[in-house]
A protein has these predicted regions:
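Extended, highly charged accessory segments
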Residues: 1-189
């Protein structure tokens, strides 16, 4: 049943868990397949990367806010390399990145070579190109009286507003909201 001998650790008493032999076999298979694809199991100290059909999956057990931070950094770097803005899916245990022309080695390099203190500055430059900024700008713009209440955020000419308000307290407030509500820059360092 446990063909990879993953669940036979002396520190793990599997009988403490309500799982039958069939379930145990399924669990072992799933873990084994993951290890074959990514070379290990992700933990809070070990990040693994899987190459799927059209995406790279970064298995990171860091939680949603840290993964959001890391995901936006990786997407910005991938988009810079490929010349196209990719797609990002964030979950508490993984980051999915769809961008053409990137490899797992690229992701490892960007994670290892980006100075932690540069993270906030990089995100401040790259986030204004993100989809999330549109919604936050609509929210903050209404509070500052820039955008009328009831305006559909999808109809905002975001690039024009970003150009107009770059370097002002308005755009800084938008970024601060994103950093505080969606990301954990300190934790990602």
């Amino acid at each position: 049943i446990d063909r990879f001998n993953l669940l036979s650790s002396s520190s793990l008493d599997i009988s403490d868990y309500p799982i039958n032999e069939h379930g145990l076999g399924m669990l072992s298979e799933e873990i084994g397949e993951h290890m074959e694809k990514s070379g290990g199991l992700p933990t809070d100290r070990n990040i693994t990367i899987e190459a799927r059909n059209d995406a790279l999956i970064v298995n990171s057990c860091q939680g949603t806010k840290i993964n959001e931070t890391l995901g936006h950094l990786l997407l910005a770097m991938a988009s810079t390399k490929s010349g196209n803005w990719g797609r990002l899916i964030i979950e508490s245990t993984r980051i999915g990145i769809q961008a053409s022309g990137i490899s797992p080695e690229d992701l490892v390099g960007w994670l290892n070579e980006t100075p932690p203190d540069a993270l906030e500055g990089l995100l401040s430059v790259t986030l204004p190109n993100s989809r999330q900024l549109r919604w936050r700008f609509a929210e903050v713009g209404k509070a500052f009286g820039i955008i009328r209440h009831g305006v559909d955020p999808r109809r905002i000419n975001l690039q024009a507003l970003i150009r107009k308000y770059r370097g002002t307290v308005v755009l800084q407030e938008v970024l601060d909201k994103l950093f505080f509500e969606k990301m954990d820059i300190q934790g990602a360092k």
